[in-house]
Amino acid sequence: QMVGLLESIKPLIRVMEAGLLFIIVTHVVNAVYLTFSNKKAAANRYSVDASATSSVNSRTMIISGTIILLFFIIHLRYIWFTYQAHLFLNESETYYDVLLRNQAGYLGHLPTAIFYIIAILFIASHLKHGVQSALKTFGLTENSKWKILYSGSILIWGIIPLAFISIILSIQFGIIK
């Protein structure tokens, strides 16, 4: 039923996918540009060690961002493209059969599943940091009225990734067949 619904709104989904791709590419280009600009402009000129006041998330953005980019490439290549191009092994194979394949790039493959879990945790951390940094930038963490948004970012950081990870673990433990 869900697949039928998504098929009926496919043009809207395509627009959303293009928008998401644009945002991701813009974010990557901006992050690389800002990283190099900041290193060039502030090479050893600060008297206070920035790592003393910055979070682990903030200090590891380049690592998590690289892993997330690799995740997107793998996910798009193996799962999204396989489904979109109808690269099924036979006519009776479904989208779920594709996910369950025990081949590199698919969720039935243990090393791929482990990588997906790690990547999902990095995505969660990356998003939590982004939301909290944006709230902090606009001064919305000081006012108790806005603290619920700050706390909500932690809640989202925990629940949504666990739902995705539970799917991967269910595939690996044979609950989803």
Regions found by a protein language model. Give the residues of each.
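Membrane-embedded alpha-helical bundles that constitute the cytochrome b-like, heme-associated redox core
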Residues: Q1-K177
